[in-house]
């Protein structure tokens, strides 16, 4: 087994040598010295690259800034059968990754995760919000949405096989790379295990952290929502449409009595918007499933949207709505433009118009995400061999 250790780096001159040294200790202990340390440099200007090379690492430049881009550069440049990733700030002791390497190398799992929450966290090593809010909530969402039994989705120390890396097709360049790895591991059917690791305090008190709590937390959450549209959009949308669609139709026809309680046109002011919100949530589900494929994030290909049918249905619904409105205006004109009670008919017309407009606009937008483009830099066909 050949072992590679991938370390992302951006201006970590004061700690990179220590991190590389710990990584080399891991290679010696877990792989008998058969391995390498590869640093993905994100454009450091403080001499980090030179210090990493001096410590015995090979440096792979990452052209684009970002945690994910730096790791991808290091992993793609590595040659090991098993890859360990960890940070350059020496807050992780790479020597603790030996059980992770053993689990992957033995075939008992494809991706071995570290867990700071199950291990030891030095005082001051992890911000309060990260430890008690951000990481637990995001980890719960991953357990709930994707069925992975993990406690620390943001732990930076992980080990995985080369085959697992290729099957995950990782593309995210920011901090959400950590969540992408877990989501795609689940979608690819990879076996994931978790091991306790320690988190040490960063002694450089004057260092500006690369991690931004709220911005990066939102990036993680946004990515998880994108890959769980069935829970976030489809389920609530279907419930709203199933409940308030019939309610809206019934109240547009007349008052309804349920269990001795009268429901009249006043309740249309709740039913109509909730029904329309339900429709839009279902369209958001269609957007999300198609955008994943459009952006190269993977996932199961959705059924193709019959654009022409949705356009026709939308236009027909809109025309019927306009016809109902026209009837109201005709009656109002016939009554001498005086007071006219037409709340039910106007509500029905409004629902039809909104449904038609939502169908047409969303169908057009969704169909755009189904287009396939050929890069101008890539040949459409390969030239014939001589």
Language model features with spans:
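Acidic donor-binding/catalytic loop of UDP-sugar-dependent glycosyltransferases
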Residues: 47, 51, 88-103
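A conserved acidic beta->alpha catalytic loop
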Residues: 38-49
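Cell-envelope/extracellular polymer assembly enzymes that use nucleotide-activated donors
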Residues: 2-4, 36, 180
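Short, acidic, metal-binding catalytic loop of nucleotide-sugar glycosyltransferases
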Residues: 21-33
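Acceptor/aglycone-binding surface of glycosyltransferases and processive sugar-polymer synthases
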Residues: 62-77, 82, 94-175, 202-223, ...
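Hydrophobic helical membrane-anchoring modules
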Residues: 170-386
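A conserved hydrophobic helix/loop-capping motif in glycosyltransferases and polysaccharide synthases
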Residues: 3-12, 19, 26, 40, ...
């Amino acid at each position: 087994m050949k072992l590679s250790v991938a370390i992302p780096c951006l201006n970590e001159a004061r700690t990179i040598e220590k991190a590389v040294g710990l990584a080399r200790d891991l290679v010696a202990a877990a792989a008998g010295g058969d391995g390498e340390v590869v640093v993905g440099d994100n454009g450091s200007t403080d001499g980090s690259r030179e210090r990493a090379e001096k410590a015995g690492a090979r440096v792979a430049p990452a052209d684009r800034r970002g945690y994910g881009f730096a790791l991808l550069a290091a992993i793609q440049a590595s040659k090991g059968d098993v890859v360990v990733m960890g940070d350059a700030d020496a807050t992780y002791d790479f020597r603790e990754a030996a059980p992770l390497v053993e689990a992957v190398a033995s075939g008992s799992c494809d991706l071995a995760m570290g867990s700071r929450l199950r291990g030891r966290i030095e005082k001051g090593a992890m911000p309060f919000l990260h430890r008690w809010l951000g990481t637990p909530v995001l980890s719960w969402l991953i357990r709930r949405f994707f069925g992975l039994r993990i406690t620390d989705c943001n732990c930076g120390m992980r080990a995985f096989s080369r085959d697992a890396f290729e099957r995950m097709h990782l593309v995210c360049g920011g901090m959400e790379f950590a969540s992408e790895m877990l989501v795609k591991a689940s979608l690819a059917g990879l076996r994931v295990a978790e091991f306790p690791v320690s988190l040490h305090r960063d002694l450089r008190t004057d260092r500006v952290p690369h991690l931004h709590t709220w911005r990066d937390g939102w990036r993680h959450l946004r990515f998880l929502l994108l890959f769980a549209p069935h829970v976030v959009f489809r389920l609530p949308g279907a419930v709203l449409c199933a409940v308030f669609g019939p309610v809206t139709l019934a109240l547009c026809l007349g008052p309804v009595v349920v269990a001795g309680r009268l429901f009249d046109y006043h309740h249309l002011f709740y039913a109509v918007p909730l029904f329309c919100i339900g429709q839009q949530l279902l369209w958001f589900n269609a957007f999300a499933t198609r955008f994943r494929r459009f952006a190269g994030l993977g996932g199961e290909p959705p059924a193709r949207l019959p654009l022409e049918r949705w356009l026709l249905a939308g236009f027909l619904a809109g025309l019927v709505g306009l016809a109902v409105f026209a009837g109201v205006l005709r009656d109002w004109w016939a009554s001498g433009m005086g007071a006219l009670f037409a709340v039910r008919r106007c509500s029905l017309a409004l629902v039809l118009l909104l449904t038609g407009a939502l169908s047409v606009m969303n169908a057009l937008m969704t169909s755009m995400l189904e287009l396939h483009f050929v890069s101008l830099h890539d040949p459409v066909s390969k030239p014939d061999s001589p």
